[in-house]
Design a protein with these regions (language model features):
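Intrinsically disordered terminal tails
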Residues: 1-69, 104-114, 154-241
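Membrane-helix exit/interface motif
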Residues: 65-79, 94-108, 134-137
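A broadly tuned preference for mixed-charge, low-complexity surface segments
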Residues: 82-85, 143-144, 237-241
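Functional transmembrane-helix hotspots
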Residues: 137-155
C-alpha cells in the first residue's frame, strides 16, 4: 500500500515542471493585466494619440508675460501604442490559456509529448521576443517623450511633475507618467516570466527527449533478449538434424 502511493522520481520531476510553469503562467497573466489597463486608459485620455516618440518644444506664448506653452510638432506613430497594447493583450490571453491547460495536466497527472513540448518551446521563444520588442518600444518611446517635454532636462520640472501641469494639448495628461511607469513594469515583468517559461520549456524538451531515448534503448534491449533464445533454439535444432 505504501509503495503504491509513492511517486517515482520521473513523476515528481514532471509535477515540478508543471507546477513551476503554472505559477509563471499565472504571474505572466497578472503582469499582462497590469500592463494593458494603464495603456488602455492612456489611449482614452490622449484620444487615440500616441505620446511615444512624440516630438515637440516649449515656446513663448506671450512675450510680455513670458508664458511658455508646449507645442507638439509631431505626435508619435499610433502603431507603436497599438503594438504594445496588442502584445500585452496577446500575452494576457496566452498566459491564461496555458495556465488553465497546465493546471489541468497537473491535476490529472498528464504530461506533454515530445512534439507538443517542442511546440510550446517555440511559442515561448516567440512570445519572449515579441514582449521584449514591446517593452523596448515602450521604454525608448516614453524616454523620447520625457526628453521632449523637459527639453532634455533643461526644464525645472521633471517628467513626473509635468503630469500635474495642464500642457494645453487638448488631451488629459494628468496621469501619463504613472500610466506608462506601470505599463513598463507590467511588460518587463511579463517578459521575465516568459523568459523563465522558455527555460522551463527547454528543460522539459530535454527531459522528454532523454526519456524517449531511454524507452528506445529498453525496447532494443528487450528485442535482443527475446532474439537470443530464438537463435539458440534454432541452432540446437540444426545440430540435432
Amino acid at each position: 500500500m505504501r509503495s503504491s502511493r509513492m511517486q517515482s522520481p520521473g513523476t515528481m520531476a514532471v509535477d515540478n515542471f508543471l507546477f513551476g510553469q503554472c505559477i509563471l503562467y499565472f504571474l505572466a497573466f497578472l503582469f499582462g493585466f497590469i500592463a494593458v489597463v494603464p495603456l488602455s486608459e492612456n489611449s482614452d485620455d490622449f484620444q487615440g494619440k500616441c505620446l511615444l516618440f512624440t516630438e515637440g518644444m516649449w515656446q513663448n506664448e506671450n512675450m510680455t508675460m513670458g508664458k511658455q506653452r508646449f507645442i507638439v510638432e509631431e505626435w508619435g506613430p499610433e502603431s507603436s501604442c497599438r503594438f504594445i497594447t496588442f502584445v500585452g493583450i496577446v500575452s494576457l490571453i496566452l498566459s491564461a490559456v496555458q495556465a488553465w491547460r497546465t493546471f489541468f495536466f497537473l491535476c490529472k497527472g498528464h504530461d506533454d509529448s515530445l512534439f507538443h513540448a517542442f511546440l510550446n518551446l517555440l511559442l515561448c521563444l516567440l512570445v519572449v521576443f515579441v514582449v521584449f520588442v514591446a517593452g523596448t518600444i515602450s521604454s525608448v518611446g516614453f524616454s523620447a517623450w520625457c526628453d521632449a517635454v523637459t527639453e532634455n532636462g533643461a526644464m525645472p520640472s521633471s517628467c513626473e511633475d509635468l503630469q500635474d501641469t495642464d500642457l494645453e494639448l487638448g488631451v488629459d495628461n494628468n496621469s501619463f507618467y504613472d500610466q506608462f511607469a506601470i505599463a513598463q513594469f507590467g511588460l518587463w515583468s511579463a517578459w521575465l516570466c516568459w523568459l523563465g517559461l522558455t527555460v522551463l520549456a527547454f528543460l522539459k524538451v530535454y527531459h522528454n527527449h532523454r526519456q524517449q531515448e531511454l524507452l528506445d534503448s529498453l525496447v532494443q534491449e528487450k528485442e535482443l533478449l527475446l532474439g537470443h533464445p530464438l537463435q539458440r533454439s534454432s541452432y540446437n535444432r540444426n545440430a540435432m538434424i
